[in-house]
Amino acid sequence: MMHSHVTILADRQMTARRITQQAADRTAAARLARGPLPQTAARLAARLREHFDPHTLPVQQVLALAEEAGEFTAAYRRWAGLARRSGTWHDVEAELADVVITAYVTAHVLGIDLDAAARAKAEVVFTRGWREPPPAA
């Protein structure tokens, strides 16, 4: 009987330590995620470089970006009622955030200044004009 009380106490202590560690991990993650997205992406890319082969990391990131875009599309389809199961707007937001974060990390891994590339592309978009004339009033 005594053994079971000791076991229960040990399990509770282990659970408390795990919860405390998870809270500390979330706090550390929140600290790392603060600040401008390009700097956050640089930190994420640095972590990826620590854990993955530098020769395969670029292709892994390109494939991850394509995967995230697909997940965003699927989340939107579910929310819009175009899929067998339904989804929430929060899912759409979260998946789009994954696309943006993964795009920034991929750009960093590939040595692309995504902010500069996006500004240059926006300039092109605004100078090409709209393809369709506005509807008549």
What are these regions (language model features)?
Residues M2-L96, V100-A137:
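Flexible "arm" and connector segments at domain edges
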